[in-house]
UniProtKB/Swiss-Prot annotation:
Major localization listed first in the record, in broad terms: nucleus
Transmembrane residue ranges: none
Name of the protein: Transcription factor tau subunit sfc1
Subcellular localization, as worded in the UniProt entry: Nucleus
Gene3D superfamilies the record matches: TFIIIC, subcomplex tauA, subunit Sfc1, barrel domain
InterPro entries: TF_IIIC_su-5_HTH (IPR019136), TF_IIIC_Tfc1/Sfc1 (IPR040454), Tfc1/Sfc1_N (IPR041499), TFIIIC_tauA_Sfc1 (IPR042536)
Coiled-coil stretches noted in the UniProt entry, renumbered to this chain: none
Length: 456
């Protein structure tokens, strides 16, 4: 086997993106022979300082060149004769100039009178021509602005690697009729939960028709839920989780559709109710009504995942409280010792509106204080407790029908005593805190923790 000695000579390689049919034109695109020699010499001494630019229009002074990137290599340079395929002049290639950047946007100045005047005077470096050069400042309405282009249009030098691929989770399947369609092969398992609202005449009595037979694990969760729904027909998801084994947490959302339906509006919103049980027809269901609060907390608020409200501890993960789970000594008696409605109201349920809104205001005040890390103000609590319980018909009266003079007199009458002044101060502070937190308004949409009421 023949061996060849590698020469001590070292070379730099230039990868030109064009065809070198004309040697002189080839050198001009790289700035000339001197520019090439200087760049190659610098690449061996300090590669980061080596500058070699590719100009595809060498005669255009406003052309934006493409700069080469220098990379270190350990390649071989050989000369091969076609006649006998002999190899000679083996040398090393240490540096390579690569033009991998994208060319910048180009702007032709060929038809620009201002650029032509600028080139014929300033670029020739003639004193007399420069002395005669002037810019016409007369306002003229031009269709196009005549001025030199900027040095750079785009700062993006490397192309984006989009790597376009077909969605791996989507595939084409053949239907029974012979046609093909594109389906999601690995879509999320759908939870066939039946939902209802306060406007329906009757509640669901059985599970969804598309709900298949449960798996072994789901059946275990169902068996654990049955005694809970027999004891209490209406539950929140958080309350059920606290009564089940922690290992069932992930499977709860798949088991609930076999035993219950979900309320999407009204006083039982976001509660799971046993099939066949209609809380609108049973006054005892007042204990299962739910109160909703929107809390906006920062990361420092952490607590246990309980569904019980005692008025002293903040539980950030719970935004929905059922009446039977409220044990606060101030609020609980208000819910027990009150006269219920004869029919279930679509907004306040079995409770009269005056008592319902008083309880809601008390809970809001206590939750505000807990967010601040303080105990609720006794003055604010007593003010809410002593407030008149206004029924809904009076609470939402049409003020447009009232005389403006009478209304102004009523407002002026609020400031007739020191007690009223104190109440006004408290209300202003309460409004200020509401604006700061943006944290407590009755839920018009489900909170972050309840974006997926099925548990995702």
């Amino acid at each position: 086997m023949n061996s060849l000695k590698i020469s001590d000579n070292e070379y730099a390689l230039i990868e030109h993106p064009g065809f070198a049919n004309n040697k002189d034109a080839f050198f001009q695109t790289l700035g000339g022979v001197q520019s090439i020699q200087k760049a190659c010499q610098t690449s061996f001494q300090n590669p980061k300082q080596a500058l070699l630019e590719l100009n595809l229009r060498p005669k255009d002074k406003y052309h934006h060149p493409v700069q080469a990137r220098v990379q270190s290599r350990n390649d071989l340079l050989v000369t091969i004769k076609k006649m006998d395929n002999s190899v000679q002049n083996v040398s090393r290639i240490r540096q390579v100039f690569l033009f991998r950047d994208m060319a910048d946007f180009q702007y032709s100045t060929q038809n620009s009178p201002f650029v032509q005047k600028l080139d014929s005077t300033l670029r020739v470096l003639d004193y007399n021509a420069i002395n005669k050069f002037s810019i016409d400042l007369t306002p003229v309405q031009r269709k196009h602005v005549d001025m030199p282009p900027p040095p750079v249009f785009s700062q993006t030098s490397l192309p984006m690697s989009y790597n376009f691929l077909q969605n791996p989770l989507v595939g084409r399947v053949r239907l029974p009729n012979g046609k093909t369609t594109i389906v999601n092969l690995k879509g999320q398992c759908r939870v066939w939960i039946i939902t209802t609202n306060m406007g329906v005449e009757s509640v669901p009595t059985c599970r969804h028709s598309k709900l298949g037979e449960p798996s072994k694990t789901i059946q275990e969760v169902i068996e654990a839920l049955k005694p809970l729904f027999e004891k209490r027909p209406v539950w929140t998801r958080r309350a059920l989780l606290n009564h089940l084994d922690p290992s069932y947490t992930h499977y709860l959302k798949f088991a609930l559709p076999y035993l219950s339906y979900l309320w999407t509006s009204g006083p039982f919103r976001d509660t799971y109710t046993r099939f066949g049980y209609d809380p609108r027809k049973d006054s005892n269901a007042a204990a299962y009504q739910a109160l909703f609060f929107k809390l906006k907390l920062n990361g420092k608020h952490k607590g246990t995942k309980t569904h019980v409200f005692d008025g002293k501890t903040l539980f950030p993960t719970n935004r929905v409280y059922q009446v039977c789970d409220i044990v606060d000594p101030t609020i609980a008696p208000l819910l027990k010792d009150t006269q219920l409605r004869s029919e279930c109201h679509r907004d306040t349920g079995w409770y009269r509106s005056g008592r319902y809104y008083k309880v809601r205001d008390l809970m809001r005040e206590k939750l505000f204080a807990l967010i601040e890390g303080e105990m609720p103000s006794e003055v604010a609590v007593n003010m809410i407790l002593n407030a008149e319980e206004v029924e809904e018909s009076d609470r939402y009266s049409n003020f447009d029908e009232q005389d403006n003079t009478d209304l102004n007199d009523t407002v002026r009458g609020l400031n007739t005593s020191a007690t009223d002044d104190r109440i006004n101060d408290l209300m202003r502070n309460l409004m200020k805190r509401s604006q700061e937190h943006e944290g407590f308004e009755d839920l018009e949409e489900i909170d972050d923790d309840y974006d997926d009421i099925f548990g995702d």
